[in-house]
Amino acid sequence: MSAEDTIRKTVTENDVVLFMKGTKMMPQCGFSSRVAGVLNYMGVSFADVNVLADEGIRQGIKEYSDWPTIPQLYVKGEFVGGCDIVTEMTLSGELDQLFEENGVAFDKDAANKIREHNA
Protein backbone atom coordinates (compact mmCIF):
# COMPACT_ATOMS: atom_id res chain seq x y z
CA MET A 1 0.00 0.00 0.00
CA SER A 2 1.37 3.42 -0.93
CA ALA A 3 1.87 6.17 1.64
CA GLU A 4 -1.03 8.10 0.11
CA ASP A 5 -3.31 5.05 0.37
CA THR A 6 -2.27 4.50 3.99
CA ILE A 7 -2.93 8.16 4.82
CA ARG A 8 -6.32 8.15 3.07
CA LYS A 9 -7.32 4.91 4.85
CA THR A 10 -6.25 6.28 8.25
CA VAL A 11 -8.06 9.58 7.75
CA THR A 12 -11.29 7.96 6.55
CA GLU A 13 -11.40 5.15 9.14
CA ASN A 14 -10.91 7.39 12.20
CA ASP A 15 -13.11 10.29 13.30
CA VAL A 16 -10.11 12.24 14.62
CA VAL A 17 -6.50 11.71 13.53
CA LEU A 18 -3.35 13.56 14.53
CA PHE A 19 -0.29 13.11 12.34
CA MET A 20 2.49 14.07 14.72
CA LYS A 21 6.13 13.68 15.67
CA GLY A 22 6.06 10.97 18.31
CA THR A 23 2.91 9.55 19.86
CA LYS A 24 0.10 10.99 21.95
CA MET A 25 1.70 9.41 25.02
CA MET A 26 5.24 10.43 24.06
CA PRO A 27 5.31 13.46 21.73
CA GLN A 28 8.71 14.30 20.30
CA CYS A 29 8.22 17.96 19.43
CA GLY A 30 6.64 20.89 21.22
CA PHE A 31 4.03 21.59 18.54
CA SER A 32 2.87 17.96 18.43
CA SER A 33 2.84 17.90 22.22
CA ARG A 34 0.63 20.99 22.37
CA VAL A 35 -2.03 19.62 20.00
CA ALA A 36 -2.00 16.13 21.53
CA GLY A 37 -2.19 17.74 24.97
CA VAL A 38 -5.28 19.77 24.03
CA LEU A 39 -7.01 16.71 22.58
CA ASN A 40 -6.08 14.55 25.57
CA TYR A 41 -7.19 17.22 28.05
CA MET A 42 -10.50 17.62 26.22
CA GLY A 43 -11.01 13.86 26.38
CA VAL A 44 -11.11 13.44 22.61
CA SER A 45 -10.57 9.91 21.35
CA PHE A 46 -8.08 10.18 18.49
CA ALA A 47 -5.74 8.08 16.41
CA ASP A 48 -2.13 9.21 16.42
CA VAL A 49 0.29 8.59 13.58
CA ASN A 50 3.99 8.98 14.34
CA VAL A 51 5.45 10.46 11.16
CA LEU A 52 8.99 9.89 12.48
CA ALA A 53 8.43 6.14 12.14
CA ASP A 54 7.85 6.27 8.37
CA GLU A 55 9.54 8.74 6.02
CA GLY A 56 6.95 7.98 3.32
CA ILE A 57 4.12 9.03 5.64
CA ARG A 58 6.12 12.03 6.88
CA GLN A 59 6.50 13.41 3.36
CA GLY A 60 3.23 12.01 2.07
CA ILE A 61 1.05 13.78 4.62
CA LYS A 62 2.51 17.14 3.58
CA GLU A 63 1.54 16.42 -0.03
CA TYR A 64 -1.85 14.96 0.92
CA SER A 65 -2.86 18.12 2.80
CA ASP A 66 -0.75 20.59 0.83
CA TRP A 67 0.42 21.79 4.25
CA PRO A 68 4.18 21.92 4.95
CA THR A 69 4.33 21.30 8.68
CA ILE A 70 3.59 18.67 11.31
CA PRO A 71 1.40 18.17 13.36
CA GLN A 72 -1.72 17.91 11.22
CA LEU A 73 -5.19 17.35 12.65
CA TYR A 74 -8.02 15.72 10.70
CA VAL A 75 -11.65 15.51 11.81
CA LYS A 76 -14.06 13.27 9.88
CA GLY A 77 -11.65 13.13 6.94
CA GLU A 78 -11.16 16.88 6.67
CA PHE A 79 -7.86 18.64 7.32
CA VAL A 80 -8.26 21.11 10.19
CA GLY A 81 -4.75 22.54 10.52
CA GLY A 82 -1.55 22.51 12.48
CA CYS A 83 -0.58 23.70 15.93
CA ASP A 84 -1.29 27.42 15.49
CA ILE A 85 -4.69 26.87 13.88
CA VAL A 86 -5.75 24.25 16.44
CA THR A 87 -4.64 26.56 19.26
CA GLU A 88 -6.62 29.48 17.81
CA MET A 89 -9.68 27.28 17.28
CA THR A 90 -9.46 25.97 20.84
CA LEU A 91 -9.30 29.46 22.32
CA SER A 92 -12.11 30.83 20.12
CA GLY A 93 -14.44 27.88 20.70
CA GLU A 94 -14.36 26.92 17.01
CA LEU A 95 -12.83 23.53 17.82
CA ASP A 96 -15.75 22.78 20.17
CA GLN A 97 -18.16 23.71 17.38
CA LEU A 98 -16.30 21.52 14.86
CA PHE A 99 -16.45 18.56 17.24
CA GLU A 100 -20.14 19.15 17.97
CA GLU A 101 -21.03 19.44 14.27
CA ASN A 102 -19.21 16.17 13.55
CA GLY A 103 -20.48 14.18 16.51
CA VAL A 104 -17.05 13.95 18.17
CA ALA A 105 -17.32 13.51 21.94
CA PHE A 106 -15.29 15.90 24.08
CA ASP A 107 -15.32 17.37 27.58
CA LYS A 108 -16.90 20.84 27.32
CA ASP A 109 -15.82 21.74 30.85
CA ALA A 110 -12.19 20.97 29.98
CA ALA A 111 -12.45 23.09 26.83
CA ASN A 112 -13.84 25.97 28.90
CA LYS A 113 -11.00 25.59 31.44
CA ILE A 114 -8.45 25.90 28.63
CA ARG A 115 -10.07 29.17 27.54
CA GLU A 116 -10.33 30.50 31.10
CA HIS A 117 -6.69 29.68 31.76
CA ASN A 118 -5.62 31.53 28.59
CA ALA A 119 -7.94 34.54 28.99
Question: How would you name each of these model-derived features?
Answer:
Residues 40-59, 67-68:
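Thiol-based oxidoreductase modules, predominantly thioredoxin-like and allied folds used
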Residues 75-107:
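Non-catalytic, surface beta->alpha helical segment in thiol-disulfide oxidoreductase systems
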Residues 5, 58-63:
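TIR-domain catalytic/interaction hotspot
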Residues 17, 64-75, 81-84:
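Structural micro-motif
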